């Protein structure tokens, strides 16, 4: 009887430890625009599955911040370069050149990058990615030069300006404008010209990776974002041609830098 009781006590202890491994706080860094409009509904789904895990939302931290332990999980634009990180693709960011129908009615549709000199351009200059300097069509590359430029670190402020017929942008993230495209309030410009898509990643430090709650959230979040961003592309493809996705088969691997 005594060995049986010891085995039962050990089982209870293991189950308690397992439950505690899925309790606690995770500090998540996300791009500010995505955090403002999309993130909370996604996290509600996760917390329905893991109610004992609390997610703390931070904005715009870099891979060096992640490496320093300022957050536990971060979304990064482009392949992480610093050592000591654990990463998985969350899918690609697609960037589209757009303007409002009202703006185009007043100022005309730019068809090629050189015609941007006749337009007011809104330029994203925030911390999430580098400023767009060129556009690509096939093997051709052309510089982006506006007649007038307004720079902003706030992608949502740029979206608002576009919707208010105030100018054009050549690199609006699809995630921020998919509903506007479907409603026709924003219209694709510069047919065939794009800022090339950028693969994005979920990353954590190797130290945080040892926490089970981080591992569980990390993989759930990466796959949820892959599905979400693929759904945006599927919706948008009905109204605009998108760049080919050559990386689609390579998004299931967790790797270390």
Residue ranges and their predicted role:
Residues 19-26, 117:
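Immediate post-signal peptide segment of exported/extracytoplasmic ligand-binding proteins
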Residues 142-188, 194-195:
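Hydrophobic hinge/microswitch elements
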Residues 25-29, 74, 122, 169, ...:
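Short, well-ordered beta-strand segments
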Residues 1-17:
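Alpha-helical "hinge/linker" immediately C-terminal to small N-terminal DNA-binding modules
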Residues 49, 58-152:
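Acidic, Gly/Pro-rich loop/turn segments at junctions of secondary structure
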Residues 52, 174-183, 193-257:
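C-terminal effector-binding regulatory domain of bacterial HTH transcription factors
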Residues 23-83, 234, 245, 257:
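Central regulatory/effector-binding core of bacterial HTH transcription factors
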Residues 88, 114, 159-160, 215:
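Alpha-helical segments flanking ligand/cofactor-binding loops in enzyme cores
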């Amino acid at each position: 009887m005594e060995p049986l009781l010891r085995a039962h006590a050990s089982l209870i202890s293991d189950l308690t430890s397992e439950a505690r491994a899925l309790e606690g706080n995770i500090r998540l860094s996300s791009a500010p625009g995505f955090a403002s409009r999309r993130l909370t509904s996604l996290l509600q789904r996760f917390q329905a599955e893991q109610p004992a895990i609390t997610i703390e939302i931070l904005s715009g931290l870099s891979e060096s911040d992640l490496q320093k332990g300022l957050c536990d999980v971060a979304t990064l634009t482009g392949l992480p370069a610093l050592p000591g990180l654990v990463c998985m693709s969350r899918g690609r960011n697609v960037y589209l050149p757009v303007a409002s129908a009202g703006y185009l009615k007043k100022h005309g549709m730019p068809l090629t990058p050189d015609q941007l000199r006749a337009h007011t351009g809104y330029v994203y200059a925030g911390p999430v990615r580098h400023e767009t300097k060129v556009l690509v069509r096939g093997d051709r590359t052309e510089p982006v030069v506006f007649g007038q430029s307004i720079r902003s670190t706030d992608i949502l402020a740029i979206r608002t300006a576009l919707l208010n017929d105030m100018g054009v942008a050549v690199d609006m993230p699809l995630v921020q404008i998919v509903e506007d495209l479907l409603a026709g309030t924003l219209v694709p410009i510069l047919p065939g010209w794009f800022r090339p898509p950028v693969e994005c990643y979920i990353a954590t430090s190797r130290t945080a990776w040892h926490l089970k709650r981080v591992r569980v959230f990390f993989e759930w979040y990466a796959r949820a974002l892959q599905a979400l961003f693929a759904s945006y592309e599927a919706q948008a493809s009905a109204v605009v041609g998108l760049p080919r996705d050559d990386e689609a088969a390579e998004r299931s691997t967790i790797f270390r830098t």
